[in-house]
């Protein structure tokens, strides 16, 4: 007869059983952040850095959208224009449209991000109320040239849009 105890290790310490269940999760030890990670987080907690970064990214998005939508435009060209003249005319229109979109999206990103960061720091909370307030500030300031009624409509519209986008992305994360 074969001895069954010979197959077992003789370390003296009994090891805990390993869970073979796929649903069980392994507990990971807590890892403290490094100095570089702490400094990087401190940089991103600065409202000016957030606002400028959002402004630059918004400007880039506006530039790309302006180029794309400018290319889709069907400008009124005269039959007397040569192909080269039509190309130059279309390129100028695309450039002008993309530059205008770039400026608009840059200001929008900068104002929204700065307002949200300032409200978040003042309230010491990260929730949807910050998004609504920042959306109101952004929408109101972007449409303020149209008068107080336009500013109120812009405030309500952009705040609603911002909250809906926030809820949509929170649901999918």
Curated annotation (Swiss-Prot):
Induction note: Up-regulated after antimycin A or rotenone treatments.
Superkingdom assignment: Eukaryota
Reported tissue expression: Expressed in young cotyledons, roots, flowers and leaves.
Localization per record: Mitochondrion inner membrane
Transmembrane regions listed in the UniProt entry: 52-72, 101-119, 128-144, 151-168
Transit peptide, start-end: 1-18
Disulfide bridges in this chain: none
Membrane topology: Multi-pass membrane protein
Pfam families: Tim17 (PF02466)
Effect of loss of the gene: Embryo lethality.
Region feature (Disordered): 1-26
Cellular component annotations (GO), alphabetically ordered: TIM22 mitochondrial import inner membrane insertion complex
Entry keyword set: Membrane, Mitochondrion, Mitochondrion inner membrane, Transit peptide, Transmembrane, Transmembrane helix
GO biological processes: embryo development ending in seed dormancy; protein insertion into mitochondrial inner membrane
Claim: Membrane is one of the keywords in the record: yes
Family named by the database record: Belongs to the Tim17/Tim22/Tim23 family.
Summary of the function given for this chain in its UniProt record: Essential core component of the TIM22 complex, a complex that mediates the import and insertion of multi-pass transmembrane proteins into the mitochondrial inner membrane.
PANTHER family tied to this protein: MITOCHONDRIAL IMPORT INNER MEMBRANE TRANSLOCASE SUBUNIT TIM22
The protein's name in its UniProt record: Mitochondrial import inner membrane translocase subunit TIM22-1
